[in-house]
Design a protein with these regions (language model features):
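Central hydrophobic cores of alpha-helical transmembrane segments
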Residues: 63-72, 217-227, 262-269, 398, ...
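Hydrophobic alpha-helical segments
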Residues: 200, 374-463
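Membrane-embedded catalytic interface detector for glycan/lipid assembly enzymes
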Residues: 32-35, 91-95, 123-256, 260, ...
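Hydrophobic alpha-helical transmembrane segments
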Residues: 19-27, 48-55, 102-117, 184-199, 203-210, 224-232, 306-316, ...
Length: 463
């Protein structure tokens, strides 16, 4: 372990100790205490990004995007609370007391700090690793063929899934996708195959020449996918598809210039307005949907950044709600949800009425039933750490950070080695779903998408 890594790890440990000392000395929740925790959060995310920058020399990489997303979803409202800017219609204070939020804040900071410490410990600079030219050329050919195969196989299921979603949204609105009216026959099988469509496009993107017609066609398809996502009322996958495209260009083609970043920032502001409008209008009619988006953006009272972060930050809800149920009403899981998630590799061949993973590892469904809610609240990595290990959940987050770094860090995955870069951006594409879900989704992403692609390419290279 080099001196820089030791200093970064020590700085994070010291920082979280200071946060906890403040929390312990001011155990009675007050508005000032909540704001102070928000300030600690600002400092912690800045320290995390700065430490990653000085350790790796890069900042706009898959791991950093995942880390920022984790903070925005798990701590976003606390960031805004420092400035009294939380959108009232999204505020967690409508469901929880100051004391509930205060406890959730310190727990979230501890877990996210542990996650990043795990990543720092896992980081290993492999920039000097050289891939043999003949192996790299074989990987290009194999990945290109694999991309064509995945796109051709997933195309029809992808189209079917999206047409069904469009019909449901047009008929029942956004909520129809998640209610009884949104049930799709064989939806799981179709969705599993359809989800290979974008990874297939990413295979083709990485093996196409920059500026070529094939690359431009792929970006046009990405744009159409994003429009379809927004029409259906979704946003997360559209945002991450944009982020993956920028990651590809910045880390695989050539670094983006300062002028380019300015242009992207201006475009990002406009995109935030659109995303905020989508969130506001997605429950309504689709008759004049895109015209309504334009009209909503002209509202001077709308601040897209505040609206967007307020909604993202409401994902602290599962943690705060779980803390009110466990351990008072139900006991801790002691790692069982992680173990049951791993059993999802075993198909249900009639041994069970419901697969054990579906019963014990889908914690969003558990929370919906335990809290007697009429809608699915989702879940989070931090909430799952709590329900399993309580105050010691940070240990699970440290281990998770270690392995997430191994997958997401493109230096540790040998820079521009095409296979490992491909796996990193596929994981990034799937990662926003993971932040707002339980561990079982991470297992499924690895099992159904990343491992098959990895082992297929490695097997073909060795032939």
């Amino acid at each position: 372990m080099n001196n820089t890594k030791i200093l970064c790890v020590a700085a994070h440990i010291l920082y979280i100790i200071i946060c906890y000392i403040y929390y312990d000395a001011n155990s009675n929740a007050t508005s000032e205490g909540l704001k102070m925790m928000g300030l600690f959060g600002w400092g912690q995310i800045a320290l995390s990004l700065f430490s990653w920058r000085i350790l790796t020399g890069k900042i706009f990489v898959p791991y950093a995007i995942f880390l920022v997303a984790a903070y925005l979803f798990c701590f976003g409202q606390s960031f805004l609370g420092v400035f009294d800017l939380i959108a009232e219609n999204r505020s967690l204070f409508r469901s929880f007391s100051e004391s509930d939020i205060y406890i959730a804040q310190i727990y979230t900071l501890m877990c996210l700090a542990a996650f990043h410490i795990g990543a720092l410990l896992a980081y290993k600079n492999s920039k000097n690793f050289v891939v043999e030219q003949n192996i790299e050329e074989k990987e290009y050919i194999i990945i290109n063929k694999l991309g064509k195969f995945l796109v051709s196989v997933a195309f029809i299921p992808f189209i079917i899934e999206n047409i069904v979603s469009l019909v449901i949204v047009s008929t029942y609105g956004y909520n129809g996708l998640y209610g009884e009216t949104g049930e799709i026959p064989f939806g799981t099988a179709i969705g599993l195959i359809a989800d290979y469509f974008v990874p297939g496009l990413l295979c083709l993107l990485l093996t196409s020449e920059p500026g070529s017609k094939s690359q431009k066609r792929i970006f046009v398809i990405f744009a159409l996918i994003i429009l379809g996502i927004m029409y259906c009322g979704g946003r997360s996958q559209g945002v991450v598809l944009v982020a993956v495209s920028i990651l590809y260009y910045q880390n695989y083609v050539k670094p983006i210039s300062k002028k380019g970043w300015i242009t992207l920032c201006l475009g990002g502001i406009m995109f935030m307005y659109v995303l905020t409008a989508v969130a506001h209008l997605r429950g309504g009619s689709r008759d004049n949907y895109f015209q309504d988006i334009v009209a909503y953006q002209s509202d001077d009272d709308v601040n897209p950044a505040i609206e967007l972060v307020s909604e993202m930050g409401s994902s602290m809800f599962p943690l705060a709600k779980t803390m009110k149920i466990v351990p008072d009403t139900e006991d801790y899981r002691y790692g069982s949800s992680y173990m049951y998630a791993l059993t999802s590799v075993i198909p249900n061949l009639g041994f069970w009425d419901r697969h054990p993973a579906a019963v014990h590892a889908k914690l969003g469904q558990w929370l919906r039933e335990a809290a007697n809610m009429s809608y699915g609240p989702g879940y989070s990595l931090v909430a799952e750490a709590y329900i399993n290990f309580g105050a010691f959940g940070f240990v699970a987050m440290l281990i998770m950070g270690f392995y997430f770094c191994k997958i997401l860090n493109i230096d540790d995955t040998r820079g521009h080695h095409i296979l490992t870069f491909l796996l990193a951006i596929i994981f990034t594409y799937m990662s926003l779903k993971m932040v707002r879900n339980s561990f079982i989704l991470t297992v499924r992403v690895l099992l159904y998408y990343m491992l098959p692609i990895y082992y297929y390419v490695r097997y073909k290279v060795r032939l």
